[in-house]
Amino acid sequence: VQGFPTIVFADASGKPFGGFVGGRSKDDVMKAMQDALKNKEALNAAEANVAKATTDEAKVAALMEVLKLAPQEYVDNFYGDVKAEIKKLDKDDKSGLKAADAHADQLKKEQKDVQDYLAGKLTDKTTPAEALQVVKAYPDRDKLLPETQQDLLMMEFGTYLNSTGDVDGAVLILDKVAELMPGTEAGQRAPRIKAGILANKDQIKTQIEAAKKAQSK
């Protein structure tokens, strides 16, 4: 569940084929339902092609189409059998599925390592300046996956801005986030944050100075 309400359209076996998150008007709900039913028809056709496939290569291609049409947030829980079959048949990983799963596993490990590191260093009494040094001291940052490096840079951005009030210096960190991997969520979010803080530069500086004065009392 990603938000309220979360609506899922599923078949009789409970396998999702569409849905949406958040409140919608009656017309939008009907459209979402129609779109989901069209997707279900496409899924049925793709699954039929799997059954018709006469070679491993053709079967992998058909199975990949099933994965493409499946709601991505439910793939691991409800289409795991499809992924497993692709991995079994696709010996040379031409689909890239094995590499993608290995990348995802590595990313999860690195994110947990970062969380554990921060949990052991930061407390509710840690100042932004101290937190900045903790984040910057994370070992071997340049050897991490780009997504993990972006997470650390976003933390560095927040702690740097809150400890120094230096908006211009902070946006340079956001630039690094965007340059590192533009297509990720962080890479897309960084330019929007940059535009927002530059548009409200004086107000942000005032708020940070007020917060620093309050902390020093």
Language model feature labels by segment:
Residues 2-43:
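Non-catalytic, surface beta->alpha helical segment in thiol-disulfide oxidoreductase systems
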Residues 14-15, 39, 48, 52, ...:
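A sequence-level detector of short, solvent-exposed, charge-rich linear segments
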Residues 26-55, 79, 201-208:
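Pro/Ala/Gly-rich low-complexity, hydrophilic intrinsically disordered segments
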Residues 53-217:
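Oxidative protein folding and maturation machinery
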